[in-house]
Amino acid sequence: MWTANILTLFPDLYPGPLGSSILGESRKNGKWDLNITDLKLFSEKNKRVDDSPFGGGPGMVIKPDVIDRALLSLKSNDFPIYYLSPRGVKLDAQISNSISKLDGMTLVCGKYEGIDERVIKHYNMIEISIGDYILSGGDLAALSLIHI
């Protein structure tokens, strides 16, 4: 069964759009599965998921240990890992076609200035952008990618 794993700070965003229309019906009929992982559950005692970028820089990034623990918790973690990022490869028909042939995918949704670069490299994440515009985070891009 095709599976989408989503790592996000906003898990409540997904059930509505993915529970209605043709996607909702196909999920009810067992055609695909959705695993939403709340990154906040993988924070330490202080409940902080963000920190200054390693090596300096503006803003805050999601901490690498939070992403690491969340990825390791997935039941099916052998899927390609896509990090939704404005600096990623721009989504086009060829990429969409290759994604549609996968058995599943893991989507990491950034927030703030993104996620720590070290975790992107460690997990060989594929950075992908859905276009040249600014969104409030990776969640709306993840919803778009799931619709492929």
Predicted regions span which residues?
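Hydrophobic/aromatic beta-strand patches that form the interior of the parallel beta-sheet core
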Residues: 5-7, 35-37, 82, 105-107, ...
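A short acidic, often aromatic-flanked loop/helix-cap motif at beta-alpha or helix-coil junctions
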Residues: 40-45, 89, 134-137
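Short beta->alpha connector loops at strand-helix junctions that form conserved
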Residues: 126-138
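N-terminal nucleotide/polyanion-binding subdomain common to many enzyme families
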Residues: 1-74
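Short, glycine/polar-rich helix-capping loops at beta-to-alpha or helix-loop-helix junctions
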Residues: 113-120
